[in-house]
């Protein structure tokens, strides 16, 4: 005998939505676990591996997120957040002798090498010699900065009397030795050809190349070409569509500034030459999800050669990384 029974069907959309919610929760838990492991690893640096003769860590390490960083450095938080800041882990260090001296060691996790490099380049003293710590470093008797991999590190001293710079260098070396990652520079710096480049002029900019919001994040580098300083830049966009849109917005800006632009079809249909307000001639080209250019040009042909070399270097570097 057939026994009828009722079965309540759920719409497919409802089931799909529930699955999506479950996946989101699982992904959140996974990211949280990974993040927690990363946090504990940096904290261990102050508990298990910090070893500087005559100095000890006071209490527990402190930690700040993008939401709370302003509590520690007030208005300076916006600068770091603009460069992809993930988390700050730090600790206070004092002499084992009980003197009133103090040192603050702050480790900024910037998410990736490019962000850490960008922060360091904008904070560094161009006149100060490198100390050979991490990827690059500089410092004085009471202040030392270095970057390594995705980390940017500041060490600030509050000494009651003048002390040898070696104190901070020992601390920085100890921290650098135990930070994860390597001392290599961001791979994107290889996009700039070496010929006529001004050594050390590379910068990673967050907040607008040439002050343009539509050129938000990218690299710039200075060159000496025929006795004139020229700046090349590479803007990184999320997609080809975004890159094309940025070029169009640039053209709109130039038109509003009463600057004419002429197409450069040899570099593609979205490439042009113009004059940027407050600068000399500028060449802009779009290549994939990048916008590449050079400004302060007094020799257009030399500018074209430089951009052609940059395009070649990008293709070569990208091919090696595959």
Regions found by a protein language model. Give the residues of each.
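Boundary at the C-terminal end of the N-terminal hydrophobic targeting segment
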Residues: 36-38
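Short S/T/G/P-rich N-terminal loop/turn motif that feeds into the first structured element of a domain
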Residues: 223-230, 287-297
């Amino acid at each position: 005998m057939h026994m009828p029974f009722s079965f309540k069907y759920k719409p497919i959309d409802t089931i799909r939505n529930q699955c999506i919610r479950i996946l989101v929760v699982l992904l959140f838990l996974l990211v949280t676990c990974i993040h927690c492991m990363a946090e504990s690893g940096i904290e261990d640096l102050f508990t298990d591996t910090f070893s500087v003769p005559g100095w000890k860590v006071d209490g527990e390490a402190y930690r700040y997120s993008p939401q709370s960083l302003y509590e520690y450095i007030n208005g300076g938080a916006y600068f770091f957040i603009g460069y992809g800041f993930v988390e700050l882990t730090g600790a206070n260090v004092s002499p084992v002798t009980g003197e009133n001296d103090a040192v603050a060691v702050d480790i900024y996790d910037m998410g990736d090498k490019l962000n850490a490099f960008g922060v360091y380049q904008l904070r560094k003293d161009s006149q100060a010699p490198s100390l050979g710590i991490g990827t690059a470093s500089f410092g004085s008797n009471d202040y030392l900065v270095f970057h390594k991999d995705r980390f940017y590190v500041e060490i600030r001293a509050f000494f009651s009397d003048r002390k040898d710079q070696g104190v901070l260098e020992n601390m920085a070396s100890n921290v650098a030795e135990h930070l994860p990652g390597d001392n290599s520079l961001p791979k994107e710096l290889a996009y700039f050809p070496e010929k006529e480049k001004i050594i050390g002029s590379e910068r990673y900019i967050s907040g607008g190349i040439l002050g343009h919001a539509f050129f938000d994040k990218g690299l710039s580098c200075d060159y000496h070409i025929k006795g004139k300083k020229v700046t090349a830049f590479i803007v990184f966009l999320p997609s080809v569509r975004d890159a094309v849109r940025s070029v169009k917005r640039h053209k709109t800006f130039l038109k509003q500034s009463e600057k004419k632009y002429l197409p450069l079809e040899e570099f593609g249909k979205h490439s042009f030459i113009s004059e940027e307000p407050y600068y000399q001639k500028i060449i802009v080209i779009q290549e994939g999800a990048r916008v590449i250019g050079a400004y302060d040009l007094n020799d257009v042909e030399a500018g074209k050669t430089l951009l052609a070399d940059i395009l070649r270097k990008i293709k070569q570097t990208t091919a090696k990384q595959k």
